[in-house]
A protein has these predicted regions:
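Surface-exposed loop/turn elements that mediate protein-protein interactions on large endomembrane-trafficking
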Residues: 1-28, 43-68, 88-114, 137-161, ...
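Short beta-strand elements that form the blades of beta-propeller/WD-repeat-like
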Residues: 1-9, 32-44, 75-88, 127-137, ...
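Repeated scaffold domains used in trafficking and secretory/extracellular systems
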Residues: 24-37, 65-80, 114-127, 162-174, ...
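Solvent-exposed serine/threonine-rich low-complexity stretches and specific carbohydrate-binding patches
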Residues: 110-113, 161-162, 207, 256-257, ...
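Eukaryotic tandem repeat interaction scaffolds
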Residues: 128-235, 528, 537-625
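Hydrophobic multi-pass inner-membrane translocation pores used for secretion
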Residues: 160-172, 178-180, 205-230, 239, ...
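Trp/Gly-enriched beta-strand/coil motifs that build multi-repeat beta-propeller-like domains
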Residues: 301-336, 359-363, 367-399, 404, ...
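Solvent-exposed loop/turn segments flanking beta-strands in beta-repeat/beta-sandwich domains
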Residues: 332-351
Length: 677
């Protein structure tokens, strides 16, 4: 007989020894098997129902209350007999053999027990033998005695007093075994003694991490182990079934997992458990040709013993513009497995480490990814880059039984391209020319515009040599792949294009010469409504020119067109994208008195009349567009204070009259020089 649990409800099944066929038993009330027989007893109140699974005959119910009051328990020792405990109404208990006869029920007292004994358990080893635990009221230790009952003689024939409370017990014609467990202890001792001797002559096997240990006896060997392997959070050698020789110190592992065992015919045992090779089920334990116990599967219940990968639910494409997070799940044969998933961005090699976990009663390992590079500070807010990812799952059995399992797969992250984004993760980057004249891009630590460059690894855009340029303009996508590009003008007036790759910049391509006539350059916005990034250039005479983007790397701009004159009153221009009004890119301009003005783009390369934003902007060395750092649909602005070198973010509001919020400082500001773009 085997027992299974599903959602806290037990079910029972009977497996035929001969052919391994399994029959589900009715009801969820416990069944008790009579050792070395096909008899099962199921109790409800004082009624005991016996099923003979060998003959398949109809169940026979016996109500012990018809005999006399006080019969509250009983286990079949044969088709028509029970070993029962009778509670004397005047006090004390007696062990009785109750037999069903043609004239009714007959009770016979089992002799050899002290008056007033308190019987705590009765186990039927065979139709001939029972194991009984009882407490002697005269014994001040209150430790249960262990007695072997000869059912045919109606007498106790062996009686021992263990040193501590006992749990598992077993008996054979030659030996008696039990488990001693001191109070409040996780240690236990398996004790085996020849029958007719005393515990002083016993073999004692001390064990650690024991809980609910069971024992069994087979010719010349004691077997022990405990259940719970599939629910375990840690390793324990006792989860398997171990056989220890009674004649020497040999020990062998018989099963990798173990739940319970009952005596079988011919000196064998039947055990519920599993092996890595055969999986979970019912096993016959018998001596091999070498005299060592071995397991032979009788029936499988279909469950693997080894940790097994079952399935996954992983999205193929994750659109982080539409969804702020993505759900992943993996199903394994054991929900307690220690699971780690490493997701690697193919283009950069950047690896994310996830620890999926089970939730509620689900057996799936689940993980909800927020699209960030890490679950843990300091990088919890840095979005992961777009593109192809591989994932690799490693699951290790928490119970230590069997090898780890591995599984790999892929998924893709996508977002729409945004200006000022050089690492292709959907948010703008802050480009910085460092003191060694290298160029790097810093990513925001949170999606709200706060930065901390101490904690984020900047993306290298070029090592050294950037001092040859007197103008650097961070733009949107001008040509080639949909990544932000960069313009740089050298001191001879030649303009160069660096195309972005999502993980750096390509080699420069010459746009053309003569650009020294301009003292202000700004880009990163679509001013003409064709979804291409355009460039504004103001010459030293105060004329503002539009260079419309073409999308071609060899000729990224069309011939210039005049926007207007008198722009010389401004010492700072910034094409910022959509700040307010229609979707077209807008322009902010700071005059020499420090007043900042807003020009709303019309979408044709021209602008509305200016609107005053406010004064005091002379506090900044320069002001430039930064894209939409908080991803609310409105462009944001950076102002860089000169003393000290302190950058501030102004977040766009979408309102023409108040286009920006109050400023928000960037963290770790002392790190920056004035060379920010």
């Amino acid at each position: 007989m085997t027992r299974y649990s599903a959602d806290g409800v037990f079910s029972y099944a009977w497996t035929r020894y001969a052919d391994g066929s399994t029959t589900l038993l009715p009801g969820s009330r416990p069944y008790v098997q009579t050792g070395r027989t096909d008899l099962l007893t199921q109790g409800e109140g004082t009624v005991r129902t016996v099923r003979d699974m060998g003959t398949g005959s109809e169940p026979v119910a016996t109500d012990l209350a018809h005999l006399a009051p006080g019969y509250t328990s009983g286990v079949a020792s044969g088709p028509s007999s029970f070993v029962t405990v009778w509670a004397d109404p005047e006090g004390g208990e007696e062990l009785h053999i109750v037999t069903r006869t043609a004239t009714g029920l007959r009770a016979e007292k089992v002799t050899g027990f002290p008056e007033g004994a308190d019987f705590t358990s009765v186990a039927i080893d065979s139709p001939h033998t029972a194991l009984v635990r009882y407490v002697d009221p005269a014994d001040t230790t209150a430790v249960s005695h262990l007695a072997v009952v000869d059912i045919e003689r109606r007498a106790s024939v062996d009686d021992v007093t263990p040193a501590h409370a006992t749990s598992g017990t077993a008996v054979s014609p030659t030996h008696l075994a039990w488990v001693e467990t001191p109070a409040n202890s996780t240690t236990a001792t398996v004790v085996v003694m020849p029958r007719g001797t005393t515990p002083d002559d016993a073999l004692r096997i001390p064990l650690r991490m024991a809980a609910g240990l069971r024992v069994a006896l087979i010719d010349g060997w004691v077997l022990y182990g405990q259940g719970g392997a599939h629910e375990a959070y840690r390793t324990n050698p006792l989860y398997g079934l171990t056989a220890r020789s009674l004649t020497d110190e040999r020990s062998v592992k018989v099963l990798d997992t173990f739940d319970r065992a009952v005596p079988g015919p011919g000196g064998t045992m039947l055990a519920q458990g599993g092996t890595l090779a055969g999986g979970e089920g019912v096993y016959r334990i018998l001596l091999g040709a070498d005299g060592v116990p071995a397991a032979e599967q009788v029936a499988s219940d279909g469950r693997p013993t080894a940790l097994t990968y079952l399935s996954e639910d992983v999205p193929e494409v994750i659109d982080l513009d539409q969804d702020k997070s993505a759900d992943f799940s993996w199903r394994l044969s054991n929900r307690q497995a220690l699971t780690v998933v490493k997701a690697t961005h193919v283009a950069t090699g950047r690896t994310l480490t996830w620890s999926p976990s089970t939730r509620g009663l689900s057996d799936a390992k689940r993980y909800t990814w927020n699209g960030a590079l890490s679950d843990y500070m300091p990088e919890s807010g840095v979005p992961a880059p777009n593109g192809a990812y591989t994932w690799h799952l490693t699951a290790t059995p928490a119970n230590g039984i069997g090898p780890a399992v591995e599984k790999s797969g892929t998924f893709t992250v996508k977002r729409a391209p945004v200006p000022h984004d050089y690492d292709d993760n959907g948010v703008p980057d802050l480009v910085h020319r460092e003191y060694d004249n290298s160029l790097v891009a810093h990513n925001p630590i949170t999606p709200l515009g706060a930065y901390n460059t101490s904690y984020t690894q900047p993306l290298s855009l070029g090592t050294g040599g950037w001092q040859i340029y007197d103008r650097i303009v961070a733009t949107g996508d001008l040509a080639g792949p949909p990544h932000s590009d960069l313009l740089a003008r050298d001191r001879a007036g030649v303009l160069w294009l660096y195309q972005g790759t999502g993980k750096g910049l390509t080699r420069r391509v010459q746009v053309g010469g003569g650009w020294q006539v301009y003292d202000k350059l700004t880009s990163a916005a679509d001013l003409t409504g064709d979804n291409r990034t355009d460039l504004l250039a103001a010459d030293k005479a105060g004329v503002l020119w539009l260079y419309k983007g073409t999308g071609s790397a060899s000729a990224p701009f069309a011939k210039r067109t005049k926007v207007g004159s008198s722009w010389g009153v401004y010492n700072n221009l910034a094409a910022v994208g959509n700040v307010a009004g229609a979707a077209a890119g807008d322009l902010v301009a700071r005059d020499r008195a420090g007043v900042l003005w807003l020009y709303l783009g019309k979408g044709d390369g021209t602008f509305t009349a200016r609107t005053r934003i406010g004064g005091g902007w002379q506090a900044y060395d320069h002001v430039f567009g930064f894209g939409d750092v908080d991803r609310d649909g409105y462009a944001d602005l950076i102002g860089l204070a000169e003393a000290p070198n302190k950058p501030y973010v102004y977040r766009g509001t979408g309102l023409r009259t108040t286009p920006f919020t109050a400023r928000q400082p960037l963290y770790n500001d002392a790190y920056f020089s004035l060379d920010l773009y």
